[in-house]
Regions:
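Glycine-rich phosphate-binding loop plus the immediately following alpha-helix
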Residues: 2-50, 74-84
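A short glycine/serine-rich beta->alpha loop
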Residues: 11-16, 62-66, 150-159
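Buried hydrophobic packing segments
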Residues: 28, 112, 166-170
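A cross-family phosphate/adenosyl-ligand binding-site feature
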Residues: 36, 176-192
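A contiguous, well-structured pocket-lining segment that forms one wall/lid of small-molecule binding clefts
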Residues: 44-124, 134-147, 174-177, 194-207
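Short glycine-rich phosphate-binding loop at a beta-alpha junction
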Residues: 119-130, 152-155
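Conserved phosphate-binding/catalytic loops in two-lobed NTP-binding clefts
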Residues: 141-165, 180
Length: 207
């Protein structure tokens, strides 16, 4: 979760402490034998299910910061699957997918809403592969629409292509002549905070 104060001026508010959202979707899909990548198939199933059918944990919903954790939710879903299989009960895939997806969305939207209120921004942008999730896109638009905050999401055609999203940032730097020196070394594990003006996590008040 990043506060973009200007192009190249980023404040990292918080991030996942374990699994990323897309990774959690992939692992749940794998546990169900639905293949890879898991996001599209889980999303498609969820659209046909009841998000209240199964209660899964909303990890770190009230943690008092902007950190996320998906590992516990993933484990809870896998434990449920294993329990149903041992009992010989058929799993309602749409209901399970919808319940899992809703647990993810509730936390993502709640923390984003608090961040918007704390920073006072008037625009919210959804990025990353998870931006392709229709339910998450709709939840952000509904929540922030009521607050008068403009929501921007990438076209679905590029949401699953990380290279395209990175290229957009590079194009902006190119057009503004924001070139790095030739002494810059490649670092596949570089963090956004290393290139921003402030990498210190921000603790929200009143969460």
């Amino acid at each position: 979760l990043v506060h973009v104060r200007a192009w190249g001026d980023y404040v990292v508010l918080g991030s996942t402490i374990d699994d990323a959202v897309g990774e959690a979707f992939d692992k749940v899909a794998k546990a169900l034998g639905l293949g890879y990548p898991g996001g599209p198939v889980i999303s498609k199933l969820a659209a046909q299910g009841n998000p209240k059918a199964i209660h899964f944990p909303r990890a770190m919903m009230h943690s008092g910061d902007y950190s996320f954790s998906l590992s516990g939710l993933k484990t809870a879903v896998i434990t449920y699957i294993e329990g149903e299989n041992r009992a010989g009960r058929a799993i309602n895939l749409p209901d399970l997918a919808a319940s899992f997806e809703q647990a993810v969305i509730d936390v993502q939207v709640a923390k984003a809403k608090t961040a918007v209120e704390e920073t006072g921004v008037s625009d919210f942008c959804v990025g990353g592969g998870v931006a392709a999730n229709p339910a998450l896109r709709a939840a952000y638009k509904e929540t922030f629409g009521c607050m008068g905050v403009r929501v921007t999401v990438p076209p679905m055609s590029v949401c699953g292509d990380n290279a395209a999203m990175i290229a957009v940032g590079a194009l902006r730097s190119y057009r503004t002549q924001g070139f790095s020196p030739l002494t810059l070394d490649a670092n596949p594990n570089a963090q956004l905070g290393l290139w921003s003006s402030d990498a210190t996590p921000v603790v929200p008040s009143g969460m």
